[in-house]
Design a protein with these regions (language model features):
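Exposed beta-strand/loop interface patches that mediate assembly or binding
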Residues: 1-109
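Parallel beta-helix/beta-solenoid repeats that form elongated, surface-exposed shafts/blades used
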Residues: 85-139
Length: 139
């Protein structure tokens, strides 16, 4: 039974990405599977996203693959993880958006924290910027 599951889903490695089209395509390096499959590279694997969020995973990221009907030629990428970049120490209920450079927007019980990792912040195409706050502190 477990062998059959290995043919339906698996954790593989991202070895390339093309974000130029309507659907992001990944190059995936698959390790050998338990049913006699050899390790191989798959090109142009579609990656699915939740609406409103997008990213390009760093090379070497883990990717959860779903193989439709157990066919490795009919694979889609449904989730990615890059362990070295993942923020640690969040509490239950916290959320964060982050990138490989250390830029992070963290939402916690104490409030919203934005870290630009020493890089500039640019706001484009705004008709107005309103700060509805009692105090601004610059350090």
């Amino acid at each position: 039974m477990m062998r059959g599951f290995e043919n339906i889903a698996g954790i593989e490695s991202v070895s390339g990405a093309d974000d130029s089209g309507e659907v992001q395509k990944l190059q995936i390096t698959e390790k050998a599977a338990g049913s006699g499959f050899m390790a191989r590279v798959l090109d142009k694997v579609s990656r699915l996203f939740a609406f409103g969020f997008t990213s390009v995973p760093p090379l070497g990221s883990e990717v959860l693959m779903l193989r439709l009907g157990g066919d490795r030629n009919c694979s889609i990428a449904i989730s990615t993880n890059h362990r070295p970049s993942r923020p640690k120490g969040l509490q239950p209920g916290d959320s964060a958006m982050y990138d490989v450079r250390g830029i992070m927007i963290k939402m916690t019980a104490d409030g919203l924290e934005i870290s630009a990792a020493g890089l500039p912040i640019v706001i484009h195409n705004a008709s107005k910027l309103t700060l509805d706050i009692p105090e601004v502190e610059c350090t």
